[in-house]
C-alpha cells in the first residue's frame, strides 16, 4: 500500500511548479501522518493516481509545510483542493469514498469555463 507522503509530495519550494503551473488539473491532498482519516484515504488516492492520467495528485504534509496550509486556509484534514489553471476550484474536507470524491471532482471541473 502506498502512503500519501510517497504520493508526489510537494513543498513550499515546489508548489508553484508542481501545482500552479501544471498543465492538467491537480488534486492537492493536505495531510498529516498522525491523521487516521488521512491514512484511510491513502489507498484511494494511490489507486486514483495510478488509474487517472487526466488528473495529477500531490500531497502536502501540513506539519512540515505549515506555510502552505495557512496560505490555503486548511483547518481540517484531510483537505483536498482541486486546482485548475493555477486556481483553486474546489475545497473538500474530510475522508470520503472514491466514487464520491471522483464525482465531486468531475462536477467542479465541469463548472469551469471552456478553454481552461
Q: Which residues fall in each region the model found?
A:
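A short beta-strand-turn-helix
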Residues: 8-26, 66
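Conserved redox-active cysteine motifs that mediate thiol-disulfide chemistry
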Residues: 30-44
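Non-catalytic, surface beta->alpha helical segment in thiol-disulfide oxidoreductase systems
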Residues: 82-116
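N-proximal helix/coil linker or "cap" segments that precede and/or mark the start of modular domains
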Residues: 1-6, 116
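Conserved Rossmann-like nucleotide-binding pocket used by diverse enzymes
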Residues: 6, 31, 56-58
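Short pre-active-site segment immediately N-terminal to redox-active cysteine/selenocysteine motifs
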Residues: 23-24, 30-34, 76
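Structural micro-motif
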Residues: 66, 72-81
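Conserved helix-turn-beta segment immediately C-terminal to the redox Cys motif
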Residues: 24-25, 40-60
